[in-house]
Structure formats: structure tokens, C-alpha cells
Amino acid sequence: MRLKNIQVENFRNHHSLAFQPEEGITVLYGPNGSGKTSVLEAIHYCALTKSLLGAPESECLAFSEEYFIISGEFVSTRGTSLSVKVSYGKDRGKLVQLNQSEVKPFSQHVGTIPCITFSPSEIAIVNGSPGERRRFLDNALSQSDRRYLDELLDYRRVLQQRNALLLQLASSSGGSREMLDLWTENLADLAAGVTLRRISFLGELSVYFEPLQTSLAGKGSHLVTYRSSFGTIDSGLSRDELRDRYIKRFKETQRQELLRTQTMSGPHRDDLLFLSNGREIKKYGSQGQQRAFLISLKLALFRYFSHRLPESPICLFDDMFSELDAERTSEIFNILEDCGQTILTTTDGSLHPASQAVSVTALPGYRGG
């Protein structure tokens, strides 16, 4: 997949802007606050229908404006043209269109334009809460496996229903134990499917991650493993076997769950463990080591997508090279040369000779950040 051009109107600090990136590596440079990240965010909207930074649409409006429009033109590996339009108005909400047809729900669009991102705030994947790592997992799998996304959404819906029933039972305001058993069985089956797919994905991702991390961090053991709130999950466990174990666990903890009015184990409570030479990098890695670990994860994700999907992903990397030395920066650029279309932002336009440098202030329509 390749972005041909993108145009924005009333988005962030851009009242009108157009951008045509190169096929390979494009370095979009400019001073801090000039709107470089906003360009990546607009592309991210076209790919995944939401902000790169996790911001609500209302925060993406240009100052004093009532609406924004993002229009992107893409071309697939087979030469098929894709037109994406994302618009938002205070009075009507968000609208996503693909080739002039409305997309509903928005989740139907996920995976159409594969996209891999890096932003400084994503270091929380390595050193933040378990929720950040689960989000990384779910975002990656949702783009590459439609069935996973559907099952994850079903899991979240059933989890919400079960928690609501636990609250009803705890407060004696309705519900029945028979109904709880039914929701428990449904949740256990979905939990088994989500968990097993996550574990399988990490095994596939590790094939690409470990050599990349070795090239950036040096020889040693670099591992990404799944940490289940359920306990150890034996290799080769079937979905039915794991479902039965979840049912047993839910029944064992039912009294505590009624007291807390929440489901205490399952994929929504799981985590990832990142190890470098046997030590948890979240606790013992320096900022530079943690950043290199995250970059290796993202580059591994590119290779995973490239081998699994019919379309090569677009890479959107925001301020990736700060805190990295010249040797690591050069090594990453060498890897990026094989990564299809990559758009980087930086304050320095002379990072690497293989890249095309474009000043954000020189883009058509630019009026200042």
C-alpha cells in the first residue's frame, strides 16, 4: 500500500494543507510545533479512522472551526486506487468514506490500509501499564486478522454484560445465577479464542523481532512472552481445553467477583513480558534501550504484516531518532530501506542520504504551526 497524496482542512494547526510523499523514505522535517505530527495523524485517520495520539475528534479541530476534513488517495500493490475521506463536525460527529461509500461500523475499515506507527508516547508500551501492551497487541492483530477483531469486540461486549450482571447480583437488584452461568460460558469461550490467538501471534512476531533486536542492541537473549492473569497456559492447549479451564477459574473466583463486581481474570487483565538477557527491560533498561526495544517491535511488526498480508503496510514514525546514537540511527535507516513507504518526522532534514527530505513549512497551503 502507498499513499499518493493527502489533503487536510481545519485539522489541528493546518487550515489547509497538501502532502505528496515519496514511494520510499520521506523525512518530513521542521521545528517543534510546526505541525509535522499532525500530518502523520491525518494519515493515521485515513488508515485506522482514529487519532494517532488517541485524541477525541473535538481536539483535532483547528482553532475556532466547526469541522475538519481529511482526504487521502492510496494505491494498492496491485495498482487499485483507494480514496478515503474522514470528516468530523461538532453537530454530526464523524463520517468515514471509502471510495465515496460510507463505512459503518468504523471497525470494518481496519486492515484495509495497513499502518504501523511510532510516536514518543508509545514508549509506554515498554515501560507503562499492562493496558498499553494489550492495546499494542490488539491493534496489531486487529489489522492482520479480521476474525480476531470480531472476536475481541464480542469478548468486550460479553465482558461488559457479565460485569453488569455481577453488579446486579451483588446489589440484589436483578439477575440470576443461571444467567451468570450462561454469560460465564460465553465469556470463557471467547477468552480462550482471544488468548490463544495472542500467544500464536507473539510466537510468529518473535521470529522477526529477535534478530532485529540483536542488530540494534547486540547479541544476547531478547524475548517477548505472554503473561496470563489465568496462570501458565500449556503449549498445545486446545480452545475447548482452555475454555473449560476458564470456566473453572471463573467459578472458583465467583465469590470474589461478586464482591468486586468485576471479572478478575481473562484477556482484559493479561500482560506482555519484555526480557533482555533475562532481565525485564521495563525495570532495568535505560531510556535508550527501551526505545530501541520498541523500535525493534515496530520493525518486526512491519515484517510480520508484509509476510502475512496482501498489502505492505505504510510506516508512520514520529520523532523516532531522538535519544539514539548515530550508529543505531544508521542501522535503522538500513532496515527501513526495505520497508516500503515510510514517513518520518524530525527537526533535522539531513538524517540519511537514502531519504527524501521535505520541509513541512514548504507544503502547499502551509500557514504556520
From Swiss-Prot:
Q: Which Gene3D superfamilies match?
A: P-loop containing nucleotide triphosphate hydrolases, RecF/RecN/SMC, N-terminal domain
Q: Which residues bind ATP?
A: G30, P31, N32, G33, S34, G35, K36, T37
Could you confirm whether the keyword Cytoplasm appears in this record? Answer: yes
Annotated GO MF terms: ATP binding; single-stranded DNA binding
Give the matching PROSITE patterns.
RECF_1
Q: In which broad location class does this protein mainly occur, judging by the first location in its UniProt entry?
A: cytoplasm
InterPro entries reported in the protein's UniProt record: DNA-binding_RecF (IPR001238), DNA-binding_RecF_CS (IPR018078), P-loop_NTPase (IPR027417), RecF/RecN/SMC_N (IPR003395), RecF_2 (IPR042174)
Q: Localized where?
A: Cytoplasm
Q: Which Pfam family, just one, is annotated for this protein?
A: SMC_N
GO cellular component terms, A-Z: cytoplasm
- For this UniProt record, give its keywords in alphabetical order, as a comma-separated list: ATP-binding, Cytoplasm, DNA damage, DNA repair, DNA replication, DNA-binding, Nucleotide-binding, SOS response
What's one GO BP annotation on this UniProt entry?
Answer: DNA replication
Q: Which NCBIfam families match?
A: recf (TIGR00611)
Q: What does this protein do?
A: The RecF protein is involved in DNA metabolism; it is required for DNA replication and normal SOS inducibility. RecF binds preferentially to single-stranded, linear DNA. It also seems to bind ATP.
Q: Which family does it belong to?
A: Belongs to the RecF family.
Protein name as annotated: DNA replication and repair protein RecF
The gene name on file is recF
